[in-house]
């Protein structure tokens, strides 16, 4: 059951880093075209 805990921590760390970079830098890729 330790593998599940490591996977959860791994996903949480990557998620936090991804959102930190996404909110820190301006969105270069704009999905909504106005």
Curated annotation (Swiss-Prot):
Any one Gene Ontology BP term: photosynthesis
Keywords recorded for this protein, A-Z: Membrane, Photosynthesis, Photosystem II, Thylakoid, Transmembrane, Transmembrane helix
Membrane protein topology class: Single-pass membrane protein
Gene Ontology CC: one annotated term: photosystem II reaction center
Protein localization: Cellular thylakoid membrane
Keyword Chloroplast: no
TM region(s), chain numbering: 3-23
Entries under InterPro entries matching the protein: PSII_PsbT, PSII_PsbT_sf
Pfam families: PsbT
HAMAP family given in the database record: PSII_PsbT (MF_00808)
Record function comment: Found at the monomer-monomer interface of the photosystem II (PS II) dimer, plays a role in assembly and dimerization of PSII. PSII is a light-driven water plastoquinone oxidoreductase, using light energy to abstract electrons from H(2)O, generating a proton gradient subsequently used for ATP formation.
Quaternary assembly: PSII is composed of 1 copy each of membrane proteins PsbA, PsbB, PsbC, PsbD, PsbE, PsbF, PsbH, PsbI, PsbJ, PsbK, PsbL, PsbM, PsbT, PsbX, PsbY, PsbZ, Psb30/Ycf12, peripheral proteins PsbO, CyanoQ (PsbQ), PsbU, PsbV and a large number of cofactors. It forms dimeric complexes.
Membership in a protein family: Belongs to the PsbT family.
Protein name as annotated: Photosystem II reaction center protein T
Lineage: Bacteria, Bacillati, Cyanobacteriota, Cyanophyceae, Nostocales
Gene name of this polypeptide: psbT
């Amino acid at each position: 059951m330790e593998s599940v805990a490591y996977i959860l921590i791994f996903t949480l760390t990557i998620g936090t880093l991804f959102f930190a970079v996404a909110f820190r830098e301006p969105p270069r890729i704009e999905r909504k075209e106005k």
